[in-house]
Swiss-Prot record:
Main location: cytoplasm
Presence of keyword Cytoplasm: yes
InterPro entries named among the record's database cross-references: PurM-like_C_dom, PurM-like_C_sf, PurM-like_N, PurM-like_N_sf, PurM_cligase
Full protein name: Phosphoribosylformylglycinamidine cyclo-ligase
Compartments, record wording: Cytoplasm
GO cellular component: cytosol
Top enzyme class: ligase
C-alpha cells in the first residue's frame, strides 16, 4: 500500500489562490503608475527610473510602517477596503516631513490563509492611498503562513521611497525662536493609540463594533476606521512657495513626543491647548478612560496630524494656502528659547 501524496496546498499554502489574487490586483496597481515605472508587477524586483535631471543633488528618503492594532477594528467590522490607505499614509507622511516627494511604495501582507477577494479589497485601499500621495505601487509580498496567524487575521507593513534635493531637506535645523507652529487637522485617530482606544471602548464602555458611540452620530467601526489623512499634496504645494523650517508627523507619542524630534538645541515648543478644538472622540475617550491630560497628549494626535514650524511673517499666508487646499489648520503655538533642564514641549 503506497503512502498518499501531500501537496503544498494540503499544508495550507494555495499557490493558485495567490495567482488569482495577483490577477485581481493588477488593475489596482496600474492605476497608481507613474512615467518612471519600468515594469509591471510580478518580477523579482520593482523597477523605477529616477529622472535625475529634475534634481541638482537628489537624496532618496525611505520610510516603513504598519497600522498597528487598528487592524483589529477592521477584523471585527469585516471591512478591509480602507486599511490600506492607512498603511500608505503612515509611510508617506513620514517622508514628506523631510521635504521628500514620495516616488514609489511596496507592501507586505501576511495571513494564515489567503482569501483573494479580501486581499484585493485590502490592496484597493493601498492603491487609493498611493493615488492620493502621487506615488506608484511597484511591488509587494503576500505571505500565506498557516499556523502563524489565527483565523482570518492578517498583518501589513508598507515601505515608501521619496526624493528631495539635498539643499531642500527639512530637518528642523533652521527652526528659530519666534517661529510659529501651525497644526494641520487630523481626520481622527489616524493609526495610533488604538490599543488604548480599544480597551476604553470595548472594555470600559462595553460597546460593540456596530454600536453608536454615545455623544457621536457614528458607530465604533465608522469612527475608528476613518482613514488616516495623507498630507503629501498639500505640503508639496506649500514647499513650492513658502519657507518651512520643520515638519512633525504626529503619530505614536502624540504632540509631546513628536514635536521634539524636529527641535534644534536651545529651542522648545509652546503649544496653546485652546488654539484648536479636538474632535469629540478624544474627550469621550478621556472621560470614559479617566485619562490624565498629559497621557492623552502623548498617546493620541488629539486632532492635529501635522505640525509645521514657519517664520512668523509667513504664518497667515500659509494658513490661507492650506485653507485653499481643503486643510483645516491653526496657529497652535510658537518656538521659544529652551532653558537647560526644561521640557521640549510645554502645553499651556
Amino acid at each position: 500500500m503506497s503512502e498518499s501524496r501531500i501537496t503544498y496546498k494540503d499544508a495550507g499554502v494555495d499557490i493558485d489562490a495567490g495567482n488569482t489574487f495577483v490577477k485581481m490586483i493588477k488593475p489596482l496597481v496600474k492605476a497608481t503608475s507613474r512615467p518612471e515605472v519600468i515594469a509591471d508587477i510580478g518580477g523579482f524586483g520593482g523597477l523605477f527610473s529616477l529622472n535625475s535631471s529634475k534634481y541638482k543633488n537628489p537624496v532618496l528618503v525611505s520610510g516603513t510602517d504598519g497600522v498597528g492594532t487598528k487592524l483589529k477594528i477592521a477584523f471585527l467590522a469585516n471591512r478591509h477596503d480602507t486599511i490600506g490607505i492607512d498603511l500608505v499614509a503612515m509611510c508617506v507622511n513620514d517622508i514628506i516631513v523631510q521635504g521628500a516627494e514620495p516616488l514609489f511604495f511596496l507592501d507586505y501582507l501576511a495571513t494564515a490563509k489567503l482569501d483573494p477577494e479580501k486581499g484585493a479589497s485590502i490592496i484597493k485601499g493601498v492603491s487609493e492611498g498611493c493615488i492620493q500621495a502621487g506615488c506608484a505601487l511597484i511591488g509587494g509580498e503576500t505571505a500565506e503562513m498557516p499556523g502563524f496567524y489565527s483565523g482570518d487575521e492578517y498583518d501589513m507593513a508598507g515601505f515608501a521611497v521619496g526624493v528631495v534635493d539635498r539643499d531642500k531637506i527639512i530637518d528642523g535645523s533652521s527652526i528659530t525662536v519666534g517661529n510659529r507652529l501651525i497644526g494641520i487637522a487630523s481626520s481622527g485617530l489616524h493609526s495610533n493609540g488604538y490599543s488604548l482606544a480599544r480597551k476604553i471602548i470595548f472594555d470600559k464602555m462595553g460597546l460593540g463594533i456596530d454600536d453608536i458611540i454615545p455623544g457621536l452620530d457614528k458607530t465604533v467601526a465608522d469612527e475608528l476606521l476613518t482613514p488616516t489623512r495623507i498630507y503629501v499634496r498639500s505640503i508639496l504645494n506649500l514647499l513650492r512657495d513658502f519657507p518651512i523650517n520643520g515638519i512633525a508627523h504626529i503619530t505614536g507619542g502624540g504632540l509631546l513626543e513628536n514635536i521634539p524630534r524636529i527641535l534644534p538645541n536651545g529651542c522648545k515648543a509652546l503649544v496653546h491647548k485652546n488654539s484648536w478644538q479636538p474632535p469629540p472622540i478624544y474627550q469621550i475617550l478621556q472621560n470614559a478612560g479617566n485619562i490624565e491630560e498629559n497621557e492623552l497628549f502623548r498617546t493620541f494626535n488629539c486632532g492635529i496630524g501635522m505640525v509645521l514650524a514657519v517664520p512668523e511673517k509667513e504664518a497667515d499666508e500659509v494658513l490661507i494656502r492650506l485653507s485653499g487646499l481643503n486643510e483645516h489648520a491653526f496657529v497652535i503655538g510658537e518656538i521659544a528659547k529652551c532653558e537647560a533642564g526644561s521640557e521640549c514641549v510645554e502645553m499651556i
